[in-house]
Amino acid sequence: MIGSVLTKVFGTSNERVVKRLLPIVEQIGALEPEIEKLSDEQLRAKTAEFRAYIAKAVEGVDDEDEQHKAIQRALDDLMPEAFAVVREAGRRVLHMRHFDVQLIGGMVLHQGKIAEMKTGEGKTLVATLPCYLNALAGRGVHVVTVNDYLAKRDAEWMGKIYEFLGLTVGVIVHDLDDEQRRQAYAADITYGTNNEFGFDYLRDNMKFDLKDCVQRKHFYCIVDEVDSILIDEARTPLIISGPTDQTTDKYVRVNRIIPALEQGEEIEKGEEKILTGDFVVDEKHKTISVTDEGWEKIEQLLGIGNIADPENWDLKHHVETAIKAHSLYKRDVQYVVKDGEVIIVDEFTGRLMPGRRWSDGLHQSVEAKEGVNIRREDQTLATITFQNYFRLYKKLSGMTGTAETEAAEFDKIYKLEIVVIPTNRPLLRVENPDVVFRTTQEKYFAVADQIAELNKNNQPVLVGTTSIEKSELLSQILVRKGVKHVVLNAKYHEREAEIVAQAGRLGMVTIATNMAGRGTDILLGGNADFMAKQELLKKGMARSISPAEGAINPMAAQGMLRFYYQGQEFETTQENWDRVFAQHSASVAQEREQVLAAGGLYIIGTERHESRRVDNQLRGRAGRQGDPGASRFYLSLEDDLMRIFAREWVSTLLQRLGMEEGVPIESRMISNRIEKAQMAVEGQNFEARKHLLEYDDVMNKQREAVYGLRNQLLAGLDQKELIVEDYVPNILSGIFDEYAPEKQHADQWNWEEIRKKLIDHFGFDYQVDGLDVADLTRHELGEEVFSRLKERYLAKEQFIGEEPMRYHERMIMLSVLDGLWKDHLLNMDHLKEGIGLRGYGQQDPLIEYKRESFDMFEAMMNRFQEDTVRYLYLMQIVGPDGQPMQVPTRLRPADASPNGVVHAEPAPLNGSAPIPEQAAPPPPPAIPTRQPSTTIDAIEREFEKKKQQELSHARMAGGGDGSDAVNTRRVGEKVGRNDPCPCGSGKKYKKCHGAEA
């Protein structure tokens, strides 16, 4: 009660946010007459003026975070004038002037928030305001779209404004090479899809040279259709993977027995739940449970012993996955089979997702079920979730027509506030109440009757369905009724934009899956733009442009115009375009009046989606920019949402109402119940995404550390100091802690193992080197061994030269790190698979996952130090004649160094290849020797080969700065976590350099 009174007095928080921006809108409006007087050259010169202001603001500021703050303050100062400049450029170049509400949308985006704008309110044009403003900083602005078509279209369309104002525009699409990508990212504003941006980030962190990387730092990002990308896509991580050597026979073997299994159900008897049959499917949680009888039958069918035995665990997992593939994954619903390949269908948009694969053997199980070629399981080489990728940006914002229902998730995961932008004109769409039928069949016949009725009046109709299967079922009914219509689903997605653009024409009936052409406006009377393109192509008045040509020369030549049609780029003369476009514009204007008289676009929903957002998106296709329109949902009590999430309530309702066949009901009670079911599913899906993020956050800290170290190595980190002053002492401390404990007398130390480990890690034999260890204390032993090892390293560096040594240090460190990281990702996958079972032992799986993954990561980094040091100390030197040369173990005058060629064993990417030892001096016969193998040239070839293999396997399946190197030496004594830090700060080691280590 008090809340509603306060709202009436002060307005909602959203209204207050918008109200605070109105004075700036007035300020921009006041600048308009002055800006209008400027010539094109003077308007363009404003860009250089703004850039000079920003450069002055960051002068003398070295700290990166402080620089960012200074830039943001400068941009805030420039915003009114910069927005006025963009508004004028839009009017001159595109003949489109930004409305006041669009200026508000632009300010919200600049502030790093989400702007919710209704369909048809011009989100694409709104983005030009913050894009231009933030691009002035010269740090790069990324605009993320849901597909390549929209990225190309928006870059070409809005790029005219940016180019007019002296900025550059780039587009990232699937088929570009690295050089083209680098050029696109170097532009002031870069358009592309979320997948391309994410994969480029992962690929950059697999490169061996900074100049090969394509992306810049992550400064500012605007995500179009932000709900689709940051919410719907968030459950699927980006994965770059490579094939393993596992066979696919097991999938065929398991698939054969599934038809012999009987699906049962869960029966409640009091408090007890009884499972019947061989397995039970839980559609609500998308899981299956195999009964004891089912496991016995499976054991017989497979001809194995106890399925629970450790040697059969893998088989057990494949059986459960195969049952899921057969019972929960339906053809033409979750996937389609096209050209002998299983392609996933996006559950939210209905679009095909070629190249993306389900993980955990599920995709292979579906391939076995469909009898197509089964691809081997892949091993993860690099991975990141969209949540963690987009959190890399210093500033993130987004725009969509439907985000308010997910406000809590945007705030919790991304710290993004949603601001609902007022519409430019009042909304005239009529939202009719839902009608509910008893069965699916009754519902579809009623929908067909309604379409036929509306079609008599020539009113355009857009029908939304939840799957390919259901869109084709309705199509068959309409064919029998003689109603002409167009079907748009994942099977015909190539024509998506074209079909949706014409859905507002007189008498048009369009059946669409949930994609409903997001990103393409439905204009009443038709889309003159598309009609002009069709005519130009039909009459041969436009030529095709290759992707490479389009990437190298993104802008059309003088007097020419470029456009996109069905995913391809074409070019025609400006004169041809103007003439043809004018003709179609006139006919469209005439037809529009007829459509308005018929009532505008009518939206029919045939089923409620799990997410209220998707329903709102469908409704939002009608009534754009104050046009009339209407919407209604037709439902049945057999719909998935009702059947799975409100089954008991539905059966009770049927008995109470005694519904008759073909008679619909309209009830607020049913609508409320449906909304509650949707909210329950949204909550469940949010928990699933949050669960994924909690686990990926653990991995993210490790990824930041590894990628941070990689970036430091590529940027010229002093790896020599890191190796000699940190890694070598760490390894020595480990050896002495294990075989020469401080509390033991020297007589009890394991001298044989100490000697063996020193030879194994460093090729150093203290007996051959003449070091008398008999009377040395633990501390003296450590210092003496370290001193000699350091001199050996410096002698080797002197022998081959500083620059070659730095190069080989970097190459070996990167190779070892990449190999171990790849293995670590595989181990983390295995850990995640089994960690859920810890719950049965009253342990929190997430806490156990954090603890064990930290131990695994620590072990990996220790192995990294050991392998790096071993390779560098055991490198062979080969002379011009190809014969091994003896490497000096003591420093010599610099002019005595011969020009040797370095030879070494390639650093293994799997961490298991044999390690060569130093050629001279040879170790004593008592210690087994290891043979050298190939030259550094071979190492480089091997590195490059493996990198190219890994990058070529990049596909869809689903940095941080790093810490500074610790320079404190730990030789002889190991510093405890609670001991005072040796640096002399007075802090505990774990709170000082121990935290960095």
Curated annotation (Swiss-Prot):
GO MF term set: ATP binding; metal ion binding; protein-exporting ATPase activity
Subcellular location: Cell inner membrane; Cytoplasm
Protein's UniProt keywords contain Nucleotidyltransferase: no
Composition bias, Basic residues: 987-997
Gene that this polypeptide is encoded by: secA
Family: Belongs to the SecA family.
GO cellular component: cell envelope Sec protein transport complex; cytosol; plasma membrane
Compositionally biased spans, kind Basic and acidic residues: 938-953
Job of this protein: Part of the Sec protein translocase complex. Interacts with the SecYEG preprotein conducting channel. Has a central role in coupling the hydrolysis of ATP to the transfer of proteins into and across the cell membrane, serving as an ATP-driven molecular motor driving the stepwise translocation of polypeptide chains across the membrane.
Name of protein: Protein translocase subunit SecA
Assembly with partners or alone: Monomer and homodimer. Part of the essential Sec protein translocation apparatus which comprises SecA, SecYEG and auxiliary proteins SecDF. Other proteins may also be involved.
Record region (Disordered): 893-997
Gene Ontology biological process: intracellular protein transmembrane transport; protein import; protein targeting; protein transport by the Sec complex
Cross-referenced InterPro entries: Helicase_ATP-bd (IPR014001), P-loop_NTPase (IPR027417), SEC_C_motif (IPR004027), SecA (IPR000185), SecA_CS (IPR020937), SecA_DEAD (IPR011115), SecA_motor_DEAD (IPR014018), SecA_preprotein_X-link_dom (IPR011130)
Record keywords: ATP-binding, Cell inner membrane, Cell membrane, Cytoplasm, Membrane, Metal-binding, Nucleotide-binding, Protein transport, Translocase, Translocation, Transport, Zinc
Keyword RNA-binding: no
Residues annotated as binding ATP: 102, 120-124, 521
Gene3D superfamilies in UniProt: 3.10.450.50, Helical scaffold and wing domains of SecA, P-loop containing nucleotide triphosphate hydrolases, SecA, preprotein cross-linking domain
Binding residues annotated for Zn(2+), in chain numbering: 981, 983, 992-993
Signal peptide range: none
